[in-house]
């Protein structure tokens, strides 16, 4: 395996707060999938593979990156403001999706799921743009990281289904 990848991802448990079983499962799957297959390179660095600690502090997203042995590489701090609208839309469509699973036809569920994936893709592209020049990630890595960003945001007082 190459050096431009993540070998571990840690999420600040204090930021996460309490979450429901659906959100917790989605987070675990995203981390597992992320570790299994990802592209993650810190621009200007060649010390990978990397360990990522993801947290939220004062309405900012914190990417603390270390080498596998634990040497600090870089900490990137991004404003969450550009993500607020897409995260809000994502939670709204997730609420609709979980409701549809209980009460709707397969066709309706599929339509809502397509919309959910579309919003998720939008958030993933936004993340790639915001990390441009800092961290090189592929689209699939961005999708999984966006899932984790939503989990952090949910821990700050808004969770799907709430």
From Swiss-Prot:
Domain of life assignment: Bacteria
Pfam families given in the database record: UPF0262 (PF06793)
InterPro entries attached to this UniProt entry: UCP032146
Family: Belongs to the UPF0262 family.
Name of protein: UPF0262 protein HNE_1347
Classification lineage: Bacteria, Pseudomonadati, Pseudomonadota, Alphaproteobacteria, Hyphomonadales
């Amino acid at each position: 395996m190459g050096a431009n990848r993540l070998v571990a991802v840690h999420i600040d448990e204090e930021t996460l707060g309490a979450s429901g079983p659906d959100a917790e499962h989605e987070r675990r799957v995203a981390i597992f999938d992320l570790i299994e297959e990802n592209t993650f390179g810190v621009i200007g660095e060649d010390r990978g593979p990397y360990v990522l600690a993801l947290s939220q502090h004062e309405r900012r997203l914190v990417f603390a990156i270390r080498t596998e042995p634990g040497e600090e590489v870089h900490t990137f701090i991004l404003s969450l403001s550009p993500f607020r609208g897409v995260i809000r839309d994502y939670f709204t469509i997730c609420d609709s999706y979980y409701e549809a699973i209980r009460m709707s036809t397969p066709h309706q569920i599929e339509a809502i799921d397509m919309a959910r994936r579309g919003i998720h893709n939008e958030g993933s592209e936004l993340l790639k743009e915001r990390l441009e020049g800092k961290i090189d990630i592929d689209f699939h890595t961005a999708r999984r990281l966006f899932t984790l960003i939503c989990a952090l945001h949910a821990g700050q007082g808004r969770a799907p289904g709430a």
